[in-house]
Regions:
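Transmembrane beta-barrel domains of Gram-negative outer membranes and organellar outer membranes
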Residues: 42-192
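Predominantly the C-terminal beta-signal and adjacent terminal strand-loop region
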Residues: 43-52, 317-365
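Residues on the lipid-exposed face of transmembrane beta-strands in outer-membrane beta-barrel proteins
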Residues: 94-96, 100-101, 112-114, 153-159, ...
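Residues that define the transmembrane beta-barrel architecture of outer-membrane proteins
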Residues: 106-108, 146-151, 176-182, 216-222, ...
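Transmembrane beta-strands of outer-membrane beta-barrel pores
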Residues: 116-120, 169-175, 186-188, 204-210, ...
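Outer-membrane beta-barrel translocator domains and adjoining extracellular loop/strand segments
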Residues: 124-129, 177-182, 211-217, 251-261, ...
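Extracellular loop and loop/strand-boundary signature of outer-membrane beta-barrel proteins
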Residues: 138-141, 168-170, 208-213, 298-302, ...
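Outer-membrane beta-barrel translocator/channel fold
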Residues: 199-292, 296, 356
């Protein structure tokens, strides 16, 4: 009796893409750790929250009271509103986004992409004083740009059961701030290319801001996306899509130095009997020489409740072979959430509506 030849079992093709995805995610985690420890020179769009204090009258920050024995900080009643509004608009700038139609990539699919995004901000409002590029003693002299630009890269990996996982990072241009982003998508309905049925997907995403010690900012999003694909000339494929996104923004203050001109260690180490050494100190803290009074100048904005924003978006993906280009427009409604429990009274989100335009290009592998 002739022996039967056993056929080799084919290897599944999704192992290599998953290995590559794991490598990229690991790389993003390493990048995040490096950015969190980074102490690079601040640029014009980096946060500087002490600028939210009005010093235009030439008397220094009105929040600060310095005496020979102590330094105290008392925020003005509108300070928490300015902080909340700034976190709201910055949260929209770095909110999770991935410009894609509703269809997933399939369990063996993987996508690599790069994107550029410009998001409108209320640059003329006082809460945008809280960046490095604004001079607090003359805040109208230089203002932030009306549109903030972010650039980034993303990877998407298809999974079984109509699931898809994605990760990426974006940089706020002219700043040291980055946001690490990730999302999970589930396609409720997809693949009916020959029927007049649209694809429908739901998605949950998260974005964490790194590269600043002024604040921690976490943005969570839940999306609903609907799309329909069309073939063009048997070569191109066009997939228009529309969607709605609910954003939940959690912003918390870091430790802020209200007397940045005074170094607490230098002040404490200065002999008050040494007139030359005392004269070398900034005038505002000369009376505190030899004391630890300047340490009272560190403060935090009070914790606040979640900020909620709604965003509508639409775009189209144009694909040729493995190459694709996506254009998207988004509109986020003006903020209106309120936290009535802060120690200084209610903090209102006074952010304006924000438009955004994005372009993304890459490869479907």
């Amino acid at each position: 009796m002739a022996s039967r030849r056993l056929r080799p079992v084919p290897r599944l093709g999704w192992r290599a893409p998953i290995t590559g995805l794991r490598g990229l995610v690991a790389g993003l985690l390493v990048l995040g750790a490096l950015l969190a420890a980074r102490t690079a020179r601040a640029d014009r769009n980096d946060l500087r929250l002490i600028n939210l204090c009005d010093t235009s009258q030439g008397n220094g920050c009105g929040w600060v009271t310095q005496t020979p024995t102590r330094t105290t900080v008392a925020l003005d009643p509108a300070a928490n509103t300015r902080f909340r509004s700034l976190m709201s608009e910055l949260g929209v700038v770095v909110a999770p986004r991935l410009q894609t139609p509703a269809d997933t990539l399939g369990f063996a699919g993987i996508q690599l992409s790069a994107d550029v995004n410009v998001t409108q901000i209320s640059s003329g409002k006082s809460f945008w004083n809280g960046v490095e590029g604004v001079q607090p003693n003359n805040p109208n002299l230089t203002r932030p740009p009306s549109w903030l630009t972010t650039v980034g890269g993303f990877v998407r990996k298809g999974l079984p059961a109509s699931l898809e996982l994605g990760a990426g990072a974006v940089n706020v241009v002219q700043s040291g701030m980055w946001a690490l982003q990730g999302y999970l998508r589930f396609a409720v309905n997809e693949g009916f290319h020959d029927l007049p049925l649209p694809s429908l997907a739901v998605q949950a995403g998260v974005s964490d801001l790194l590269g600043t010690d002024q604040a921690t900012l976490h943005v969570y999003g839940v999306d609903v996306v609907v799309s329909k694909g069309f073939g063009i000339a048997g070569t191109w494929r066009l997939q228009p899509y529309l969607g709605w996104n609910q954003l939940l923004i959690s912003g918390a203050s870091g430790t802020i130095d209200a007397t940045p001109a005074c170094d607490a260690a230098t002040v404490a180490g200065t002999n008050p009997a040494n007139n030359v050494a005392v004269a070398a100190l900034p005038r505002s803290c000369q009376a505190q020489a030899g004391t630890s009074a300047d340490e009272g100048g560190n403060f935090r904005f009070p914790s606040q409740a979640l900020i909620t924003r709604s965003r509508w978006f639409g775009g189209a993906k144009l694909k040729l072979w493995k190459l694709f280009l996506v254009g998207q427009f988004a509109w986020t409604t003006a903020g209106g959430s309120r936290d009535a429990q802060t120690p200084m009274g209610a903090a209102d989100d006074q952010s304006g509506s924000q438009k955004a335009v994005s372009l993304s290009a890459g490869f479907d592998l």
